[in-house]
Amino acid sequence: QGFMVTLDLLGESVQQAAEAEAACQAYVHILDRLAVEGLNYHVSVKLTQLGLAIDEGLACRHLGLICACAAKYHNFVRVDMEGSAFTEATLRVFRTVSAPRNVAGIVIQSYLYRSDKDVEELLKSGARIRLVKGAYDEPREIAYPRKRDVDRSFVRLMEMMLSSGIYHAIATHDERLIAAAQEYARAHDISPDDYEFQLLYGIRRHLQRDLLRQGARVRLYVPYGRQWYAYFMRRLAERPANLLFLLRNLFRA
């Protein structure tokens, strides 16, 4: 239908090295299988699924193996951002692995105060960024508590990214933020081919199709795997409003 795809094998915060190794091998298998099937689907990984909560070096090794496999197939790995307890370590591992920007990119959350500085540093290194609002329940000491401030931060970071000349991803279902990105791109002669929008598979399907018809590049984020229940309950516990968002937009789809 013209959509691009990113696959996310559900799972995070593993406590055993064997679990982290299994997750790494699962991603290598996914990349192998995608190549066999001729599918250019990207993959998204959480570093705590690869052992970050156990040992930073373990996560580095596993991410390096996955990136090497992706490079072999000219594929792409997106490193997800998790709770703020892992933000610095996630950035450190991403930089340590130092995969080329056509092989790996990272996620930045607009609700964190620190994100302006993080984006500035990442852009200097040429990193490809996926911008999200952020879904974890964080204290006001480190994150904007009000939606309007999160949105303002999102727009500010989005403009920095679009102006960089690097291919980035704008991940949101908020039509106002999508429109802001498109308006900024038009005003600054940035082609729709130079960035993409990312949306969850099955959520706001009419919006996804409308964006395609407008000539935008649209990638669907597809979580899958057996760990869905734990993932769902954890997200719900962290931010109950997530459930309302999901239900509201399922009906709007």
Please place each PLM-identified region on the residue numbering.
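Positively charged, amphipathic and often flexible ligand-engagement surfaces
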Residues: 1-253
